[in-house]
Amino acid sequence: IRDRDNAILACHPISGNANVEEWWTPLFGPGHVLDTSKYFIVCCNAIGSPYGTLSPLTRKGGEDVSGGTWKCSPHVHAPDEQTEQLWWGPDLPKTTIRDDVRLQKHVLDFLGVEQLACVMGGSIGGATSLEWPLCFPVRFPSSPDALVTMTPEQKPYVRSIVVLAASARHSAWCIAWCEIQRQAIEADTRYQHGRYLLRDPPSGGLAAARMCALMTYRQPHSFERRFSRLRGKSNMTSAPKDSQASTLMEEGGDGDFEEDVAKIREPQAQEQYAVQSYLHHHGAKFLTRFDALCYIHLSDKLDSHDVTRDRASWSQDTSSESAMLKGVLRHLGNAPNSPRVLVLSVTSDMLYTPAEQKAIHDAVPASKLVHIESSEGHDGFLIEYPQIDRAIREFMERLNVSHNPSAL
């Protein structure tokens, strides 16, 4: 870790995992943002993710996920099975993004990281990035929720953050979409109040929830441009044999979007519209790598996101939500040694709108706002790699955020 201050913490999207090189591949390598010859890259699975750390699939007192294959072991939640009592299942307490931040801090302490060069992420990962310097302005704050007024001689724990396609709080619009997805899962008769057998999960509900989510990750123009009213292959509803290869390229799990459309255009079965085939294909594809309870846990976590929660005392003006937001976020830029903040906004994002990124930028003194031009909606944060790579590299180069901290 060199001088123990060249670490970059990457925070994954909701359906991602700790293998950041898998879902942000174009940002890796010499000359790119995640250059391992310069930086020590760290990524931790969020609590609730089925890929590790802690989730409804976790044994009470142990772990049930194979990090080598990223596949969940076929254990049970159901009370009629003797082994059920060993697994958290629906009994796992709800967690927040701040819980993830605190757990990640323990990992970084274990690794010996004394200062983070940057925390970056998109979507829920961007929300995590925003929480990081609020939770840990210094390495060891007096209490987890303490407001630390930085003095010039203090060393910030986080030197910079990149907030990509995220908001400072989960909006009513986003909460509503998450609730629709949860209801789709819970309406499946196999759900059994969360005490289902993993060999007989609520597949229909989870697939429907994923299809609903896909609609929020894109926007109407991109669907019309690709599908229009074309008819497509009915066998697109089945998951491909190698469904792990490209599932994490985009938040929507459809890194092979153009390839899928090309397949749909083949003059074969005409039973479905192409867009129906596309949605069913990716709904089924999601079932091979995710668990319904994990999905519900993570969506609940998203809903809890609000940087002003339990921080009313941080703001001098509590007359409105926007005033409180500004009052809390101003602490990210009110001192010479405050973390530098880059906010990236996808111009066509209908989930976390550009107005929400502008609100962050307006509230944080000396922050920088960059618009990522894209017609792909929210998924643009995992598609428009050249723009994103360039914006972050220029940001870090200007600040000289590297293994040499003397520039700051």
Q: Predicted segment positions?
A:
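Alpha/beta-hydrolase-fold enzymes
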Residues: L147-K285
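Catalytic histidine neighborhood in serine/cysteine hydrolases
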Residues: P354-Q357, H361-G377
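Short, proline-enriched alpha-helix->beta-strand connector loops that line the catalytic pocket
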Residues: R210, D291-L293, D300, H331-V341, ...
